[in-house]
């Protein structure tokens, strides 16, 4: 048999103790607190952090009574930042708050100061968003991204359950997968390289780190079929990684948008998700575009699909909707586009209702802020629900 043409593709992830991800989680914890008391809250909450300091700032209009400082400290503590030697002390760090109300110009243009019916609500800003899906995993997500993300989540799990007590909160993962292009569909052949850089305490040796990571992190996450004697492992390749979290690097909300989405596959319009209420189409538009792309692939209409939607501020109807199935569609893309338009309402007010996006609290949005917004399980991830699509198979 002739050798199959293959290529390498890499995706990375960071876990919840990474400074940028810490900021995403604080911003979404603030959003949860606002929506829990006032589902109509307008939230644009940014967070930044550096040694011994966390600042939340932005525009928030809400009837909720929000204790910003408590949310910051609780979120940092929940991640594991409980002393300066791990990178931040949740109970003693400086917390700065600079929150103002949403601009009345934006409020009028988008919501008509709450006088508009849901279908009349305009987009909160201009922009274009993408949704992507592929049949290469049960989650309809790229394998390189799924594995990198799950390695990061597993690192946190074995830290918190004390399987690997030497672990500290900060860490990064990266997975290179060897793929075959099957007429536009992506078929994973094997895992080429696994990279893990994790923060650790002073007591552990590099050999112990490598052995524990292989046994307790890599083995449970990466299916055996993808690993072989040629798979390369880089486990803390720089040597020591004791100083981490905000003490090691500054952090900022919205800096990990590829990790939040598809690991470099598909496309990205550039807008971050965390700290934004659902009238911000950066978030809600990307969520409905994912649901549309996933439903196309799950319905068997195509093996791989990308959907783009675009908006103008204050205008409810999207300016454009685009579908590309990379040549994997069972019917022409223009027919698939019509199916998408018939089955999905891209007006912001209707996305909010159909995906129940005003329901915050109980960590709903906080959950999205680490380990990806897509390919996740649970009732809170409403955009992952596949909509059954009717289509006519072309006669042979």
From Swiss-Prot:
Its EC number is 2.5.1.6. GO terms for cellular component: cytosol. Its cofactor is Mn(2+); Mg(2+); Co(2+); K(+). It is found in: Cytoplasm. Its main location: cytoplasm. Pathway: Amino-acid biosynthesis; S-adenosyl-L-methionine biosynthesis; S-adenosyl-L-methionine from L-methionine: step 1/1. L-methionine binds at residues 59, 102, 249, 280. GO terms for molecular function: ATP binding; metal ion binding; methionine adenosyltransferase activity. GO terms for biological process: one-carbon metabolic process; S-adenosylmethionine biosynthetic process. ATP binds at residues 18, 170-172, 238-241, 249, 255-256, 272, 276, 280. It is an enzyme of class 2 (transferase). Keywords: ATP-binding, Cobalt, Cytoplasm, Magnesium, Metal-binding, Nucleotide-binding, One-carbon metabolism, Potassium, Transferase. Mg(2+) binds at residue 12. It holds the Pfam family S-AdoMet_synt_M. Binds 2 divalent ions per subunit. The metal ions interact primarily with the substrate. Can utilize magnesium, manganese or cobalt (in vitro). Binds 1 potassium ion per subunit. The potassium ion interacts primarily with the substrate. InterPro entries: ADOMET_SYNTHASE_CS, S-AdoMet_synt_C, S-AdoMet_synt_central, S-AdoMet_synt_N, S-AdoMet_synthetase, S-AdoMet_synthetase_sfam. K(+) binds at residue 46. SUPFAM superfamilies: S-adenosylmethionine synthetase (SSF55973). It catalyses: L-methionine + ATP + H2O = S-adenosyl-L-methionine + phosphate + diphosphate. Catalyzes the formation of S-adenosylmethionine from methionine and ATP. The reaction comprises two steps that are both catalyzed by the same enzyme: formation of S-adenosylmethionine (AdoMet) and triphosphate, and subsequent hydrolysis of the triphosphate. NCBIfam families: metK (TIGR01034). Homotetramer. Belongs to the AdoMet synthase family. This is S-adenosylmethionine synthase. The lineage of its organism: Eukaryota, Viridiplantae, Streptophyta, Embryophyta, Tracheophyta. The gene is SAMS.
